[in-house]
């Protein structure tokens, strides 16, 4: 498939799985890390990491089952190696539109690295583009002149029922893995080698944090510029590889201008801000129930767990805004394959929970 492509399988038809947009009052959105989605006989990262035919079919079946069960209208995918295979799979499930802006790196004709992100939609995609880095802002941030996103960000402009055009962004921010490793020297003492590796872990980890936080900053500035020019609603989804509110990425949901009491100006700012779908869902639930909600992790590593997968929304989806069209009526964290897996079914699923939300038209 060519880069920057929109793939409408049935341009003049309406998929049997899509409700008439005039009467559709709910929109379902999901973010889905596919975890090494690469069809055999190709290998991911190393020459011997290849799915058997049975493993690959199990993975394909798991993804199809999720789509059939939850029926999201728009899905942001991460860790995509086999672009054409994914496009074929989702089209069989009624997703007539598919967008991608990059392709993986291939070494020796079969070893794949640098997976990409993609978006599938049951609604028409009107435009697809890769988000470009603002080089002037890169310099102002003190970054290297050749700074780029570790993974290209997809922007797909989707035509939603009732609302119209919505710019949907799919991201997979830089991981927490240290940007470099310490060298082991056989002629150096054990203490010296341990110190070298520990220093690399600390400094390399911070380098990854700088990359991740800078990616978020440059993306948000691009989204604001686009919002100012086009006025489209905004939806940002993906694997952030970082808890949203711990500091590195917290600016993505900056709610207002500091040290400014001008209500008119603050109202203008809200047009450009993003909200965490979970926060909107929680706020809406407080209206109907006093029960305390607990946000489930989306990723487990050893004894620790964290929320790494997010969907962020603009004011059009915030029930607290009078001008909003939709509200977040449900938030689903599909994680049974992580906390209570059935090997025969979940053995080749994914190492992340799949996060989805329901957006309901406001009355």
Tell where the protein language model's regions lie, with residue ranges.
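N-terminal, active-site-proximal structural segment of metallo-dependent hydrolase catalytic domains
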Residues: 2-115, 192-195, 340-354, 358-363
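Active-site-proximal beta-strand elements of phosphoester/diester hydrolases
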Residues: 27-39, 165-174, 197, 201-205
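Active-site flanking residues adjacent to catalytic metal/cofactor-binding acidic residues
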Residues: 32, 78, 171, 238-239
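Short, solvent-exposed loop/turn elements at domain surfaces
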Residues: 37-42, 177-179, 320-321
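A structural motif
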Residues: 171-199
């Amino acid at each position: 498939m060519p880069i920057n492509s929109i793939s409408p399988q049935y341009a003049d038809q309406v998929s049997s799985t899509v409700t008439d947009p005039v009467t559709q009052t709910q929109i379902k959105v999901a973010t889905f890390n596919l975890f090494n989605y690469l069809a055999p006989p190709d290998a991911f990262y190393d020459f011997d990491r290849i799915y058997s035919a049975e493993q690959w079919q199990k993975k394909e079946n798991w993804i199809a089952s999720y789509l059939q069960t939850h029926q999201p209208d728009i899905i942001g995918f991460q860790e995509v190696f086999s672009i054409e295979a994914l496009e074929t799979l989702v089209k069989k499930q009624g997703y007539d539109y598919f967008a991608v802006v990059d392709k993986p790196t291939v070494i020796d004709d079969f070893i794949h690295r640098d997976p990409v992100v993609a978006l599938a939609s049951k609604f028409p995609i009107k435009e697809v583009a890769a988000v470009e880095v603002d080089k002037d802002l890169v310099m102002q941030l003190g970054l290297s002149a050749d700074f780029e996103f570790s993974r290209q960000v997809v922007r797909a402009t989707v035509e939603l029922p009732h609302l119209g055009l919505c710019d949907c962004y799919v991201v997979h921010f830089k991981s927490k893995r240290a940007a470099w490793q310490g060298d082991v020297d056989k002629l150096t003492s054990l203490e010296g080698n341990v110190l070298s590796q520990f220093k690399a872990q600390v400094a390399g980890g911070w380098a990854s944090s700088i990359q991740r936080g800078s990616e978020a900053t440059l993306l948000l500035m691009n989204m604001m510029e686009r919002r100012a020019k086009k006025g489209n609603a905004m939806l940002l989804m993906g694997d952030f590889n970082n808890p949203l509110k711990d500091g590195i990425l917290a600016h993505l949901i900056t709610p207002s201008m500091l040290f400014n009491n001008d209500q008119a100006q603050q109202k203008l700012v809200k047009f450009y801000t993003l909200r965490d779908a979970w926060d909107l869902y929680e706020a809406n639930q407080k209206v109907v129930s006093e029960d305390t909600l607990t946000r489930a992790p989306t990723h487990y590593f050893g004894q620790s767990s964290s929320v790494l997968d997010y969907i962020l929304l603009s004011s059009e989806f915030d029930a607290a805004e009078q001008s909003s069209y939709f509200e977040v009526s449900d938030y689903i964290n599909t994680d049974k394959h992580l906390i209570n897996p059935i090997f025969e079914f979940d053995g080749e699923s994914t190492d992340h929970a799949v996060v989805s939300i329901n957006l309901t038209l406001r009355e």
